[in-house]
From Swiss-Prot:
Family affiliation: Belongs to the eukaryotic GSH synthase family.
Cofactor binding remark: Binds 1 Mg(2+) ion per subunit.
Summary of the function given for this chain in its UniProt record: Catalyzes the production of glutathione from gamma-glutamylcysteine and glycine in an ATP-dependent manner. Glutathione (gamma-glutamylcysteinylglycine, GSH) is the most abundant intracellular thiol in living aerobic cells and is required for numerous processes including the protection of cells against oxidative damage, amino acid transport, the detoxification of foreign compounds, the maintenance of protein sulfhydryl groups in a reduced state and acts as a cofactor for a number of enzymes. Participates in ophthalmate biosynthesis in hepatocytes.
Listed name of the protein: Glutathione synthetase
Gene that encodes the chain: GSS
Enzyme type, top EC level: ligase
Source organism of the structure: Bos taurus (Bovine)
Molecular-function annotations in GO: ATP binding; glutathione binding; glutathione synthase activity; magnesium ion binding; protein homodimerization activity
Residues annotated for substrate binding in this entry: 125, 148-151, 214-216, 220, 267-270, 450, 461-462
Obligatory cofactor(s): Mg(2+)
InterPro entries reported in the protein's UniProt record: Glutathione_synthase, Glutathione_synthase_a-hlx, Glutathione_synthase_C_euk, Glutathione_synthase_N_euk, GSH-S_sub-bd_sf, GSH_synth_subst-bd, PreATP-grasp_dom_sf
Pfam family name, one: GSH_synth_ATP
Residues bearing the modification Phosphoserine: S415
Length: 474
């Protein structure tokens, strides 16, 4: 997957000058994060880490990832509506994973009371890597699907201009023209706006559940600004604020500070550390309301690793997408090997295989946010500890994807420009809206490319490992 940046990466003086220009353009374009020293304040900000050059992505795999996104939207939506499947699939996990168990408890309470919301909104991001086959070709393999707080749609809208600028400075105008336009924040806002419209109350607002210490606020503001341009007002609140000032009326309409809420958009609530007892009570209040939750609790559960693993079993996709063999084939083509670790012969065999060949597998807990997976010797030690315990059911085992590395230059605040061997992860943003049983929107709305040094096994931009990038189609 050669791109022709090779000679450019060898001229240290030119790289330093290009890096200065690229950083200034990134700041001008709004590729920004708050600092780790002051994550609650925008008084001092920095550029978000990014690559100096766009990275090579096979055009066919980019097209394949876009083509399958509507299928993944349908699949997640179908899973979220199947309470029996969710209960059966997560039954072993919730015995040992307290976070998934708490989410599932809320799911059961809402089902028992009766789901009040009639409009459903999914904003997700399906993430892939490019498996390098023995013959040198590359294959698209899904890492995971993020159904809650799928981030960087805002900043990904602003990075193409930076890479076009870098290539233009070098006189590479043809190459600059190959960088795809990309505006996920506009598409994500379109989904929220559609859900708001279907809710049917012109004065209702969108409630964005956020953390107080939020370095990635500019990513979120991009979506807020798109909504405001449509005259849809967004209020940012923490779970604690919902506990103190949120309420439901007799029709289970949600009010915040006396203002009716049409859509609740979660940019918090996807990790155990995000919840105190008070926050769990706030989440239940939100779920009980007729406001459109993005995601509702069932959709968050549909995005767990255990559900991902069960969907890879023979016949399961067909049960969710009956009469759609082409969609099933598109989905299955992206699946890597996924293995249950539930107690029993199947789980025992998976553990034996992984301990025998640790370089071929990844051990994944039911966690979002990056930096949670175990590899190599660390994975072997965990499996040896877990193999006779019920706790192993809170993990899944996944075939390790081995992409072909390439060289790029990574730019991080406070660090020198660094040319290094890298690998990339491609995310495709999907949006769907359903009213009752009728799907009224189902589309892909843009992409995100993140790149990291091959020495880092796990973790994304927010975890401080990967940097923002753009695909250079090859």
């Amino acid at each position: 997957m050669a791109t022709g940046w090779g000679s450019l990466l060898q001229d240290e003086q030119q790289l330093e000058e290009l890096a200065r220009q690229a950083v200034d353009r990134a700041l001008a374009e709004g590729v920004l994060l708050r600092t780790s020293q002051a994550p609650s304040s925008s008084h001092v900000v920095s550029y978000a880490p990014f690559t100096l050059f766009p990275s090579p992505v096979p055009s066919a795999l980019l097209e394949q990832a876009y083509a399958v996104q509507a299928d993944f939207n349908l699949l997640v939506d179908a899973v979220s509506q199947n309470a029996v499947f969710l209960e059966q699939t997560l039954s072993s996990t919730i015995k040992r994973d307290s976070f998934t168990a708490r989410l599932f408890d809320i799911h059961k309470q809402v089902l028992k009371e009766g789901i009040a919301q009639t409009v459903f909104l999914g904003l997700n991001r399906s993430d892939y890597m490019f498996q390098c086959n023995p013959d040198g070709s590359a294959a698209l393999k899904q890492i995971e699907i993020n159904t809650v707080s799928a981030s960087f749609g805002g900043l990904a809208s602003r990075t193409p201009a930076v890479h076009r600028h870098v290539l233009s400075v070098l006189g590479k105008t043809k190459e600059a023209a190959k960088i795809l336009s990309n505006n996920p924040s506009k598409g994500l806002a379109m989904g929220i706006a559609k859900a708001w419209e279907l809710y049917g109350s012109a004065n209702a607002q969108v409630l964005l559940i956020a953390q107080e210490k939020e370095r990635n606020i500019f990513d979120q503001r991009a979506i807020e600004n798109e909504l405001l341009a449509r005259n849809i007002h967004v209020i940012r609140r923490k779970f604690e604020d919902v506990s103190e000032k949120g309420s439901l009326d007799q029709d289970r309409r949600l009010f915040m500070d006396g203002q009716e809420i049409a859509v609740v958009y979660f940019r918090d609530g996807y990790m155990p550390g995000h919840y105190s007892l008070q926050n769990w009570e706030a989440r239940l209040l939100l779920e009980r309301s007729c406001a459109v939750k993005c995601p509702d609790i069932a959709t968050q559960l549909a995005g767990t690793k255990k559900v991902q693993q069960e969907l890879s079993r023979v016949g399961v996709l067909e049960s969710f997408l009956p009469g759609q063999p082409e969609a099933v084939a598109r989905l299955r083509a992206t699946f890597a090997g996924l293995y249950s670790l539930d107690l029993g012969e199947e789980g025992d065999q998976a553990i034996t295989k992984a301990i025998a060949a640790p370089s071929c597998f990844v051990l994944k807990p039911q966690r979002e946010g990056g930096g949670n997976n175990l590899y190599g010797e660390e994975m072997v030690q965990a499996l040896e500890r877990l193999k006779d315990s019920e706790e192993r059911a809170s993990y899944i085992l996944m075939e390790k994807i081995e992409p072909e590395p390439f060289r790029n230059c990574l730019l991080r605040p406070g660090s020198p420009a660094r040319v290094i061997q890298c690998i990339s992860e491609l995310g495709i943003f999907g949006v769907y809206v359903r009213e009752g049983k009728t799907l009224v929107m189902n589309k892909h709305v843009g992409h995100l490319l993140r790149t990291k040094a091959i020495e880092h096994a796990d973790g994304g931009v927010a975890a401080g490992v990967a940097v923002l990038d753009n695909p250079y189609p090859v």
